[in-house]
Amino acid sequence: MALLWAAQGLSYIGDQIFDTTLVVWIASVLAKDQTWAPLAVSGVLIAVAIPTLVIGPLAGVFVDRADKRRMMIATDGVRAALIAFLLVSTGVVGGFRPSIEVQLASIYVVVFLTAAATQFFGPARISLVRDVVPEDARARAQSLSQVNASVSTIIGPPLAVPTLFVLGIQWALVANALSFVISLGLVVLVRPPAQPAHAPPGAAPSFMRELREGFQFAGRNVVVRTLLVSLFIVMLGGGALNALDVFFVINNLGTSANLYGFVGAAMGVGVLVGALLAGGLAGRIGLNRMYWMSLLSFGIFLLIYARLTSFIAALVLLFVVGFPQAAVNVAAAPILMGATPRELLGRVFSLVQPISATASILSTAGAGFLATSVLANLHAQVGPVRIGTYDTIFTVAGLLILAGGVYAWNNLNSAYGK
């Protein structure tokens, strides 16, 4: 497990450096002072979103058919090669500097293909974790994975900008490529137990049938369906926070946008601390209870956050919000592993990211629409409570997350007879 944990950590940090570097590189170098710069940056986000939504659900079929360790090795190798190709295609190395249009096109293609490869890596890693980690240690393993994600979020972006402007874009890309190469080497050293090959009796492999089997299992199994539906509901609320929090900080908390970075840092540290604590908490109260209790806590905290007017109080609360956010992430994967047969795990897990991304996109678009149209000029007073645009949207978001928690509470307790 230590090798998988180290490999994942390196990949996460490399991804954070890569993502941040590309955005800053496009905005401050390739598209500097251009009116189309925001559109160029948005192209990176679109290039990530498309494979997540389209390829993600399909990747699980191939993951379930393949050797999980070899799949991880192959995807790490592909991603390292793609980053190396980007060094050449953008003229960063080699002496030839193509036009801005060619450089941007190269970036979008590489980002798209890298994101596509990631859709195979994630389900393969989860399946391999299931093979090498005993059931009673999976919460602890997922807690360490969440620590990886939190640390990479905290240190990755701050490393990216100095690397870009002090050492140059070439070293930022090389660092990302090396992270995949080292991750590949660590996965090579993993020795999972032998597993019987899965082949449906009396039937030749059929992509559509196997894809349908994954969807049908996710729809029929109460535990899996509950996790996927509750995650969708929660992300409908969480997407609004991601989209509008900077405006809430400026308008409701009366704080300069220059201090907005502390908001993400406060929640990031909270998630890190929560991840360290969640493994032990799961052992005491159980994964299922930790999952729905964390969703309910997250919803309540967001309702409180919507009423705040103090920036310091908001930072403290966001630090606390990180605890249930980490606990949800720690609990979800082991619950899925326990409820899903090994031969279907890749297909089931590959639904998580597309479902979360779809809900987040809908929430972001809906919140942005409400904030700029229907609720744009909302100013009201109900007793001592002032009601405005952003706190109203966050209140609705908090209620959605609460609804997701109640749904999970009811269904998981019913499924496990509690």
Predicted regions and their residues:
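Primarily residues marking transmembrane-helix entry/exit sites
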Residues: 1-5, 38, 100-108, 210, ...
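Transmembrane alpha-helix termini and helix-breaking/packing motifs in multi-pass membrane transporters
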Residues: 21-32, 86-99, 155-175, 251-252, ...
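Juxtamembrane intracellular "pre-TM" segments in multi-pass secondary transporters
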Residues: 1-2, 192-229, 418
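Extracellular/periplasmic helix-loop-helix junction of adjacent transmembrane segments
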Residues: 21-52, 258
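Helix-loop junctions at membrane interfaces in 12-TM secondary transporters
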Residues: 88-110, 304-318
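C-terminal transmembrane bundle of multi-pass solute transporters/carriers
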Residues: 42-47, 54, 65, 71, ...
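Substrate-agnostic recognition of the 12-TM MFS/MFS-like secondary transporter fold
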Residues: 2-22, 44-83, 105-165, 175, ...
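Helix-loop junctions on the cytosolic side of multi-pass membrane transporters
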Residues: 93, 125-132, 173-203, 223, ...
